[in-house]
Amino acid sequence: MSDWVDKQNSLVSRIIDGSVTIDSVTKFEDLLEVFPSDPELHRIYAGLLQKEKSLDAADAYGRAAKLFIESGMTLQAIVCKIHEWKIFEPSQSERQTFHSSVGEGEYKDGVVQRFFAGMTNSEMTAFMTKLVPMNFPAGSMVKRFGDEEKALYFVVSGALEETDYHRLEPGGRIQKKSTKDLIKDD
């Protein structure tokens, strides 16, 4: 039995990291019956439905957001809500319910959760409408040295290497200062 569970968990991990894809809605639904509480699988399923132009994607993103909140993963829940609300505009009651859920419970990403929970409902809603979920392929450069600072990035999944540069003297050569790995929830 343990061998079967290990294989299933390995498959789920590979689906989540993108090394295995399922393009069949029916097969994905079968997988969700086995793993009904995995928020990442629900998010990927919602993305598949959205790609298929199914309005059911909104419900799937909502379910994923709920599971992310229950798992203490605020940022992932917010991204799911952004996708859901782009399909169907939420009512004021739905916005308030989501805002309240962000402010409750223990969270793995305390800093991000406190950032959003510290906002009023209208502030959080206004901020969320400005957020644009983006995917970057592995190895791509998000921002080049010298680019104008005009965006705020949140790492929702995966990892990012941040490299800071500075000049040794005014007008002198640029020297590499340091690198720092940013992971999800940074």
Label every model-predicted segment.
Residues 4-5, 39, 58:
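Helix-start (N-cap) detector for alpha-helical repeat units in TPR-like alpha-solenoids
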Residues 7-11, 27-31, 44-45, 57, ...:
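Structural register within alpha-helical repeat arrays
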Residues 14-15, 48-49, 68, 81, ...:
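Residue at a conserved register position within TPR or TPR-like alpha-solenoid repeats
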Residues 15-25, 39:
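Helix-turn-helix repeat elements of alpha-solenoid scaffolds
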Residues 18-22, 54-55, 74:
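TPR-repeat structural position
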Residues 36, 69-72, 89:
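Short coil turns that delineate tetratricopeptide repeat
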Residues 89-137, 175-178, 182-184:
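Cyclic nucleotide-binding regulatory module and flanking cytosolic helices
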Residues 136, 140-186:
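Cyclic nucleotide-binding regulatory domains
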